[in-house]
Design a protein with these regions (language model features):
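Bacterial N-terminal signal peptides that target proteins for export
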Residues: 2-12
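Acidic-enriched catalytic cores of C-N bond-cleaving enzymes acting on peptides and small amides
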Residues: 189-193, 203-210, 217-223, 237-268
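Short, solvent-exposed loop/turn segments at the edges of secondary structure
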Residues: 81, 120, 162, 193-194, ...
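Bacterial N-terminal signal peptides
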Residues: 10-20
């Protein structure tokens, strides 16, 4: 069975990092305690893509931000395709400058789940043996709640920031991002004007025999879309040609399949 699970205490590392930065001590225990129920509630919001319906997730996250008294904005790139963001403003230095902004980004949509292959309801957020199960617990509603709890803790600390910190939840990552980040970049470019750093999915925490390791990812391969066209002499299925457009296309695809592309390691 393919499982999606996240450890109840997974947000601890992020919150401890936030706490260590603050000049005044804050009690992060309430934010740790809120993480599990907030994640369970988020997993119970159906944002399976297609069709997405990410505006449901926007409403859920917006309510949590409202409870904390944090202003936020949202926009639909298409009916039901919601995107949300909130900002903690940085304090300018003596010269009136702030450092490049930091964005905490995750996507609201999740891929479909075949309940027949699950031992729990994929939209239940059921807790079993210290784990929370649900579609999106790892990809990426778990990340979204970790980031949210860190964001809420940072806001509660009232620590002066040397940069803006954004919390951003977007639509459509699982189907190309055209209604999510792609749409925002095209239609709301001002949101990213001062951004210098963006923390997103990719790296993760893994448990090995030797202990827990935090995997850091700095880049990804990107897709290369190709269109192959083959031509040949037409004929009839009852008397096929030795070489046709179809056989040429199949041979071409086989050459692509057998090609070993060199590894290009990009310095971090």
């Amino acid at each position: 069975m393919k499982k999606r699970k996240t450890r109840l205490l997974s947000c601890g590392t992020s919150l401890l990092l936030i706490a260590s930065m603050t000049a005044r001590a804050i009690d992060i225990e309430p934010f740790l305690q809120q993480a599990a129920p907030n994640l369970v509630g988020y997993l119970q919001v159906d944002t399976i893509n297609p069709p997405g319906n990410e505006s449901r997730g926007v409403a859920y996250l917006g309510n949590l931000l409202d409870q904390a008294g944090i202003p936020h904005e949202s926009v639909e790139s298409a009916p039901g395709r919601g995107n949300l963001w909130a900002r903690l403003r940085g304090t300018p230095d003596a010269d009136g400058n702030t450092q490049p902004a930091l964005v905490l980004l995750h996507h609201i949509d999740v891929v479909p789940a075949n309940a027949a292959h699950w031992t729990v309801d994929p939209l239940s957020g059921e807790q079993v043996d210290g784990y929370i199960y649900g579609r999106g617990a790892i990809d990426t509603k778990g990340l979204g709640i970790v980031q949210l709890q860190a964001f809420l803790a940072l806001a509660a600390s009232e620590q002066p920031l040397n940069r803006d910190v954004w919390y951003m939840a977007t639509a459509d990552e699982e189907a190309g991002g055209f209604f999510g980040v792609g749409w925002l970049v095209e239609n709301r470019p001002e949101l990213f004007a001062d951004v210098g750093y963006l923390l997103n999915e990719g790296g993760s925490g893994r448990r090995f025999e030797q202990g827990v390791a935090v995997m850091v990812e700095v880049t990804q391969k990107v897709p290369l879309w190709l269109r192959l066209t083959a031509s040949g002499q037409p004929g009839h299925g009852s008397a096929p040609q030795v070489t046709t457009s179809v056989t040429r296309l199949v041979r071409g695809l086989e050459r692509v399949r057998q090609t070993e592309f060199p590894v290009n390691v990009v310095p971090a």
